[in-house]
Amino acid sequence: QKRYEEAQSPYQRAAETFNELERDFPRVVRYQERAARALMGLGLVQRNSGKPVAAEKSYRQAIAKFEAMDRARGLTPASIDVLAACYNNLGNVHVDAENIEEGLVAFQRAITLRQRLTDVPYPMPSARYGLHRAQGNYANAYQKLHDWDRAHELLVAVFEDQRSLVQDHPGNRSFESHALWLFARIADGLRATSRGEELPPFADTLTQLLPQRPDVPAQVAYHLALTAGDLDDPETEAERELKDQLAQRAIAGLEAALQLGWQPEDPLAEEDAFQVLQQYDEFHALID
């Protein structure tokens, strides 16, 4: 947080400087754009410094400048990208404050802007990634509202699109990490709705997509174990079988992660998600 607070002053000075230049030279477009970009950066550091009200104000000021430019002469693709980021970040501020409905509106606006960049014959990979991030945040907001079915539908769609993006651009860590984030949100939703039996296919898709990243099978194992933990006292034979299946897959995932060089900072047995695995000999053989 201290690092973000230290970054606030340069962004503040930049915003003030370009605002003055914009007032003195209203026809110079680059001053308007730079003032708006500085405000967006200021909002980012304010949010990460624990100042959501100030961040919202900065984002709204940046949005107002970009949208005025858009009405007057249109925006370059680069400026559309920054405007979409402003709306996406504004949505995050609203969700942080549990103003979920307002967050949905902001995320939808970000999606609409991103689609201006992706609805072309050959969209830039970064534009596709930006769209998927906004769509993921939009779906996550529905989870906050406990509209699990709607959230799951949206998450599955964007997970598939993100899988395609990762396949098209192997080795991009940001693209890969977002696929992992989407998987985690899908797992959260399936646990919340007692649909743990639907998780393994998504786990398979992710591990096949990123076979060389040791953190992927480790994270997959975590969510499988967490899901198995929800079946702590299975009442039926089917539930007992599902619990065992999920636990065994979690153990296999940990084994794969360790073989790829993953080294957990803390003993796995201390993690709440792995308590359910304590009863399995294979788990103890793996970590002892």
Features from the language model and the residues they span:
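Alpha-helical protein-protein interaction modules
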Residues: 1-288
